[in-house]
Amino acid sequence: MNKTNPTIALVAGEVSGDILGAGLIRQLKAHYPNARFIGIAGTRMLAEGCKTLVDMEELSVMGLAEILKHLPRLLKIRKNVIQTMLQEKPDVYIGIDAPDFNLDVELKLKANGIKTIHYVSPSVWAWRQNRIHKIAKATHQVLAFLPFEKAFYDKFNVPCRFIGHTMADAIPLKPNRAEACQMLQIDPAQRYLAILVGSRGSEVEFLAEPFLKTALLLKEQFPDLQLLVPLVNEKRRIQFESIKAKIAPNLDLHLIDGNARQAMIAADATLLASGTAALEAMLCKSPMVVGYRMKPLTYFLAKRLVKTDYISLPNLLANEMLVPEMIQEECTPELLAEKLSAYLSDDESAVKNRLVLIQHFTDLHQKIQCNADKQAAQAVIDLLEGKENV
């Protein structure tokens, strides 16, 4: 490797990966001003100077049916990436998330003497744990957002570096509620519940009804309660409004385009589906209840495949049931309302419990606030310069 102008390959498959890639390139340019960046990039990585082989949107498909439909195209892109990388011989290949695409590329490149890093651990600690053996063969190092992920890799002697979470860097330890209310143009003197029904169509389909019925029950108990419903895009908004028209046509809601983070910062409590939103709610210091429903067969299989005691990231990070998880049969309006009312109540004990929970959230936030972009760049530099065990 030329120490001053390495060729660094990065492949991102969706917007979240493009954000990570752009932050990583920015930090790497500070160390290697003449580095060359190639791969598959979105608009943010392109703005940082990465040359892309194809439009990143070509990789951005979700759901099994959609993947099968586009499989020939995805396989062609993967073959093209492998051929290009074997010709270009980059000093390192960084697969950013998209494990179903990137791990096969990494496997081929590592076998041909190219250094590889997988940025963002697949949820191998939770399910399909046998993937760890493929990851070990495919990568020189995994960059993990969360400390329990590194602990899992350590058990299998797979090189892994905990770098902290970029979201923990982006959200302040003490979020500004007044500022969030101003951005949303809502009255900070009111009491708010944020309702996040998920970003996927299937989540909205299964969760909109119990979440709306929960809101109706809570409005009876807290008549002044205001409801904030951020929706990720127009498609999900139309889907949600259609369900609301049947379930709760007269329920007054603040429907918000995007801005889930501001809604959670402004809210006194949050009702949400599991996933990254639960981590974001924790970082926003919003007491939450996690509700999740899926098809009975999917749940039957998931129960047998998932190897963790909890499904939400705050509980996994704390290794205890910090926030209620109401899954499948327990995801009922009555139980959800009961758990949320404990956060919304003005009782002295409820206020105290809320403060204790927020302190727990703050402690966990500090654990994963490590300047992840810089840590990721340092891991790449160490691998390039032969110091990966430092």
Swiss-Prot record:
Provide the top EC class: transferase
Q: Which GO terms describe its biological process?
A: lipid A biosynthetic process
Annotated pathway? Bacterial outer membrane biogenesis; LPS lipid A biosynthesis
InterPro entries assigned to the protein according to its UniProt record, in alphabetical order: Glyco_trans_19
* UniProt EC number: 2.4.1.182
Q: Does the keyword Transferase apply?
A: yes
Q: Name one GO molecular function term.
A: phospholipid binding
- Sorted alphabetically, which Pfam families does this protein's record hold? LpxB (PF02684)
Q: Which catalysed reactions does the entry list for this protein?
A: a lipid X + a UDP-2-N,3-O-bis[(3R)-3-hydroxyacyl]-alpha-D-glucosamine = a lipid A disaccharide + UDP + H(+)
User: Organism's domain of life?
Assistant: Bacteria
Keywords of this entry: Glycosyltransferase, Lipid A biosynthesis, Lipid biosynthesis, Lipid metabolism, Transferase
Q: Tell me if Transcription is a UniProt keyword of this record.
A: no
**Assigned GO CC terms:** membrane
Q: What does this protein do?
A: Condensation of UDP-2,3-diacylglucosamine and 2,3-diacylglucosamine-1-phosphate to form lipid A disaccharide, a precursor of lipid A, a phosphorylated glycolipid that anchors the lipopolysaccharide to the outer membrane of the cell.
State the similarity comment: Belongs to the LpxB family.
Q: Which NCBIfam families match?
A: lpxB (TIGR00215)
- Record's protein name: Lipid-A-disaccharide synthase
> Which species is this UniProt entry from?
Haemophilus influenzae (strain PittGG)
Q: Which gene encodes it?
A: lpxB
